[in-house]
C-alpha cells in the first residue's frame, strides 16, 4: 500500500542517505527524513509521497539515537550549512564513510571487498572555525538592520548568522563590525528583486599558516560611499593585510564580478599549502580547510607512488598545488587548468621554486581538450592526477587518459558518486581500482571527499 501525504507513523531511522537524510522503511517503502540521526525513534509525517518512496519530517523524537547530540548553533537548521551538527563527530565520520562506500557499491557496481577501502580520514580536533574563506551575502533582518548570514535551503532568503561555528572568530567579528559601519553610513544592501542597493557580499580570506587576512566588498557599483574611512577602520581594527573592492553590477546570483581593485595593501595574501607557497586574491580556487587539505595531499602523494624519472600530468590542477607538492619526487610536471588566473598563479609559484618550464609547466586549457591533444601527440605520463569539479571527468578526459595509459591514476574527488561512475568506466578500459580513501575536508557539513588509486592492469 502506498504512503499518503500527511500520514503519520512511528518508525526507527536505520541509516543516512548520501544527502544526510535519515532513512526508514514503512510498509516496504523508503522514507527520507531530513535532520534525523541513525537509531532515532521518531513520529514522522509524510510531506511528499511518490510511487516507491516518500519524504517525511520529524513531528517528534520519541527516543534519540546513540549518535544524536544537541546542536551548538541556534540557526543550523534554517541555515542548512551544517547539515550534520545534530550528530556526534564520531557518528558523522561513520556516516561519511558509509556515503562513499554506498556510492561505489550502488552507483559504481563495485564489490567493495575487491579493493582497499578505509574509514574516513579526519582531524578530530579540527572541526570548528576551520574555513579559510567565506563569502557572506549582505541583507536586512526583520527589523531593517544590515546583517550577513547564509541563504536558507533552496532560497535566497538570508538567515542572519553573527557567530558561524565554521569560520574563524575574526571573520565573525569583522562581519558584525562591517554591518554596523554600513548602517551608520547609510549604505544599503543589494536587493536582488529590484537590482538596487550597494553591498552584495563580504568576502574574507585567511592564510592559514601565514596569518595574513584579506577583505573584499562586492558592490553593485564602482565603490562605497566614505570608502577610504570604512576600509581603513576595518584594516586597523582587524589587522587586514589587504582590502579590495569587487564590482558586480550584473543581475545575477554569481558572487564576484570581473573587475577587482585594491584599496589598501598589496591586493593579495600569501600562504603555503603542503609546502607550496601561494599568492591569493579573490578569484583563485583554494582548498578552504588547509590542515585537512594537507592530509588529503599527503594521501594523494602516497597513492601516486612516484619514481624519480616519472612524468606527472596534473589535470584540473587549479593553482597547481597538488602537482607542485609532488614535484620533488618526479622528473617532469605538466598541469592543466581552465581558469587563467589560476594558471598564472601556478607558473609564478613554479618560478619562485626555481623550476624551469621544462620541469614544471602549466597550460590554460579545458582538461578534456588538453588530454586529447596530449594523447594524439603520443604523450605517455607515468602518473596522472585528476581533481575534477563535482560533475566529474568528461568522456574526452577519460578516453584520453586510457589512451595515454599511465601506470597509476590518482583521482581526488569532491563527489563520491561521480568518482564511482568514472572509476567504473576506467575499470572497463583496463584499469584496476586499488584503493579508496574518504577524507573529511568539511566537518559538520554533508560533504565528503575521496582519493582513489587506480593502476593499469598490464602492470
Label each PLM-derived region with a short phrase.
Residues 36, 45-49, 137-141, 205-209, ...:
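Short beta-strand micro-motifs enriched in acidic
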Residues 203-207, 212-223:
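Carbohydrate-binding surface patches
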Residues 1-75, 111:
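Terminal RNA-binding accessory module
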Residues 22-27, 149-152, 216-218, 346:
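Short, acidic/hydrophobic/Gly-rich beta-strand patch recurrent on exposed beta strands
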Amino acid at each position: 500500500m502506498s504512503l499518503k501525504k500527511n500520514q503519520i507513523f512511528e518508525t526507527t531511522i536505520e541509516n543516512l542517505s548520501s544527502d544526510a537524510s535519515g532513512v526508514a522503511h514503512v510498509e516496504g517503502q523508503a522514507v527520507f527524513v531530513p535532520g534525523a540521526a541513525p537509531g532515532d525513534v521518531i513520529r514522522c509525517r509524510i510531506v511528499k509521497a511518490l510511487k516507491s518512496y516518500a519524504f517525511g519530517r520529524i513531528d517528534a523524537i520519541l527516543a534519540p539515537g546513540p549518535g544524536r547530540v544537541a546542536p551548538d548553533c541556534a540557526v543550523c537548521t534554517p541555515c542548512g550549512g551544517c547539515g550534520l551538527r545534530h550528530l556526534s563527530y564520531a557518528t558523522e565520520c561513520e556516516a561519511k564513510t558509509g556515503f562513499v562506500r554506498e556510492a561505489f557499491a550502488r552507483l559504481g557496481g563495485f564489490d567493495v571487498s575487491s579493493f582497499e577501502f578505509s574509514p574516513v580520514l579526519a582531524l578530530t580536533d579540527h572541526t570548528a572555525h576551520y574555513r579559510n574563506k567565506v563569502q557572506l551575502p549582505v541583507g536586512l533582518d526583520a527589523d531593517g538592520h544590515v546583517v550577513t548570514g547564509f541563504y536558507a535551503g533552496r532560497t535566497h532568503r538570508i538567515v542572519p548568522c553573527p557567530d558561524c561555528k565554521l569560520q574563524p572568530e575574526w571573520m565573525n567579528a569583522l562581519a558584525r563590525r562591517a554591518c554596523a559601519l554600513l548602517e551608520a553610513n547609510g549604505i544599503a544592501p543589494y536587493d536582488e528583486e529590484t537590482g538596487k542597493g550597494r553591498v552584495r557580499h563580504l568576502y574574507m580570506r585567511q592564510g592559514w599558516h601565514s596569518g595574513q587576512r584579506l577583505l573584499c566588498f562586492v558592490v553593485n557599483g564602482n565603490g562605497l560611499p566614505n570608502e577610504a574611512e570604512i576600509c581603513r577602520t576595518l584594516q586597523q581594527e582587524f589587522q587586514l593585510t589587504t582590502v579590495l573592492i569587487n564590482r558586480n553590477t550584473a543581475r545575477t546570483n554569481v558572487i564576484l564580478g570581473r573587475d577587482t581593485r585594491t584599496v589598501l595593501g598589496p591586493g593579495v595574501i600569501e600562504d603555503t599549502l603542503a609546502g607550496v607557497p601561494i599568492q591569493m586574491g579573490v578569484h583563485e580556487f583554494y582548498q578552504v580547510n588547509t590542515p585537512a587539505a594537507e592530509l588529503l595531499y599527503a594521501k594523494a602523494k602516497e597513492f601516486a607512488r612516484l619514481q624519480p624519472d616519472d612524468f606527472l600530468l596534473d589535470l584540473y590542477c587549479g593553482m597547481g598545488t597538488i602537482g607542485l607538492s609532488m614535484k620533488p619526487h618526479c622528473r617532469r610536471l605538466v598541469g592543466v587548468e581552465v581558469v587563467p588566473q589560476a594558471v598564472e598563479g601556478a607558473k609564478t609559484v613554479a618560478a619562485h621554486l626555481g623550476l624551469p618550464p621544462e620541469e614544471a609547466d602549466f597550460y590554460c586549457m579545458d582538461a578534456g581538450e588538453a588530454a586529447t591533444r596530449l594523447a594524439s601527440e603520443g604523450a605517455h605520463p607515468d602518473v596522472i592526477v585528476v581533481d575534477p569539479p563535482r560533475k566529474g571527468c568528461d568522456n574526452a578526459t577519460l578516453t584520453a587518459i586510457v589512451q595515454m595509459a599511465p601506470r597509476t591514476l590518482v583521482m581526488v574527488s569532491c563527489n563520491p558518486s561521480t568518482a564511482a561512475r568514472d572509476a567504473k568506466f576506467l575499470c572497463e578500459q583496463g584499469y584496476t581500482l586499488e584503493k579508496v580513501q574518504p577524507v573529511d575536508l568539511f566537518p559538520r557539513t554533508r560533504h565528503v571527499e575521496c582519493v582513489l588509486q587506480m593502476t593499469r592492469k598490464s602492470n
